[in-house]
Amino acid sequence: RFRDESIGHLKEMPIEWSKISLNVDSATDMRQAMMSLAESKKIFALEARMMGLLDETNPEVVANDNDKVEVPVWRYAMINYPHPLLTNGLSILDTPGLNAMGLEPELTLNVIPNAHAVLFLLGIDTGVTRSDMQVWEKHVPPSVSQRIAVLNKIDLMWDDLKPHDEIAQAIQRQTENTSMLLNIPGSRVLAVSAQKALVGKIRGDMPMIQMSGIARLESLLADEIIP
């Protein structure tokens, strides 16, 4: 992070990258490979501060320059996975929240404005927060051809003691409120449960997959986003 090269430039320099094999036939190997993305290391607090990786708002984080703090090992990762949507041309850039915007200006100056679509991931339990609005207004310009909000965790609203219609109405209200706040059509706000979609697919539980709402998101990606 002390260097001036952009991510785009570093992609042309194979020597700068570490390769981790992704064995899709082994759940254990897949888990280990994915866990490696979350690796951390300890460096001096001064270095972390200079790289913008020191959380000054956290009272538990030491401020002494000579103390050691934990920071992520990896700055950027590219994952090649043989999913049908990916093999058909879909590329997904996952930004790790608000901090990435300041630490990687390339994301906001080049990648996001030139994206075919931006999926803005929100929690249906919290809706659009103040910080969400700041990111949306500052970094997701109307010039992006497809601006889509995804309200995740709808399973938090599932309740066996409530009628299905009542739950559906509550989800619809949150969807409409998100549409209004972000100033995008209601059809561009999708309510899903990624966790239940995964469980349903693992178990072959079609009713759970249907309730998760994931099919609508997958159809949008396959039919509208892929060039």
Region annotations inferred by a language model:
Residues R1-I226:
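Globular "head" domains of long coiled-coil molecular machines
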